[in-house]
């Protein structure tokens, strides 16, 4: 087991510990994991388990220095020297869950994000850090195209033979354990044949768009979502219709 795999195993364990009492999982945050790695590396270098680094800084100092917005922060740390990383992961989680103070942090309803970091010394000591944070929603929403509805071929004065098509889409904000911003709107783009993508709707709350597709041509539509915190999702896979 690699250190990265061990960290992801602990991520799953922590969210399983929450699920066991009916709590939603926390979202892993790469920025918090980077700080957790720094914390674990500092403890490994000092050979000491401590919430205060040798330079006097705490997790709050590091989070603030990295420009991470937060309303509340919790930290759990652990040490063991089990040779197998799988055993080290299991034992540190067990240690946290048999401590009322650590369990209260892991199962708190206040937090919505967390990060994990493992530091290993040359002699095999394992230093673990888990950082829990309550902060603004920074998880982008999702959007996807649905199957289009197509009509029969008709004759239009402007296009000649064409087919009426209605594209529709769905989306929502990804839920957090706390402070989910909520879906705000969609951006929609169209591409005719192999041309450039062009916006046809921006910040719209509608969920469908209709157009006529001329025979011999193709129109593709794609969508992305925005949430109320300003997060913008990725473009969906396009759905195209040829007439």
Q: Model regions: which residues?
A:
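Short beta-strand segments within Ig-like beta-sandwich modules, predominantly Fibronectin type-III
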Residues: 199-205
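Hydrophobic beta-strand segments within extracellular beta-sandwich modules
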Residues: 114, 219-221
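Extracellular fibronectin type III
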Residues: 229-243
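Short, compositionally biased P/S/T/A/G/V-rich stretches that sit at domain boundaries
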Residues: 135-164, 170-172, 242-243
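Short, well-ordered surface patches within globular domains
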Residues: 2-66, 103, 109-114, 121-123
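Solvent-exposed loop/turn segments flanking beta-strands in beta-repeat/beta-sandwich domains
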Residues: 172-192
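A well-ordered secondary-structure block
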Residues: 58-136
């Amino acid at each position: 087991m690699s250190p990265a795999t061990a960290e992801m195993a602990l991520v799953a364990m922590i969210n399983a510990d929450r699920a066991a009492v009916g709590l939603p999982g926390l979202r892993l945050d790469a920025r918090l994991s980077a700080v957790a790695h720094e914390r674990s590396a500092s403890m490994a270098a000092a050979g000491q388990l401590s919430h205060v680094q040798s330079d006097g800084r705490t997790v709050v100092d590091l989070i603030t220095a990295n420009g991470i917005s937060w309303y509340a922060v919790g930290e759990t740390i652990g040490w063991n020297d089990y040779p197998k990383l799988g055993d080290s992961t299991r034992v540190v989680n067990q240690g946290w869950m048999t401590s009322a103070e650590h369990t209260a942090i892991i199962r708190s309803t206040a937090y919505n994000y967390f990060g994990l970091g493992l530091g290993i010394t040359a002699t095999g000591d394992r230093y673990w850090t888990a950082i829990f944070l309550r902060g603004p929603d920074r998880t982008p929403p999702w959007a996807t195209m649905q199957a289009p509805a197509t009509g029969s071929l008709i004759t239009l004065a402007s296009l000649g033979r064409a087919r009426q098509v209605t594209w529709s889409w769905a989306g929502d904000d990804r839920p957090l354990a706390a402070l989910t911003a909520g879906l705000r709107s969609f951006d929609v783009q169209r591409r005719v044949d192999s041309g450039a993508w062009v916006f046809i709707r921006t910040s719209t709350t509608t969920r469908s768009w209709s157009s006529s597709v001329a025979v011999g041509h193709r129109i593709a539509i794609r969508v992305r979502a925005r949430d109320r915190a300003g997060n913008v999702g990725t473009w969906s896979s396009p759905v195209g219709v040829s007439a």
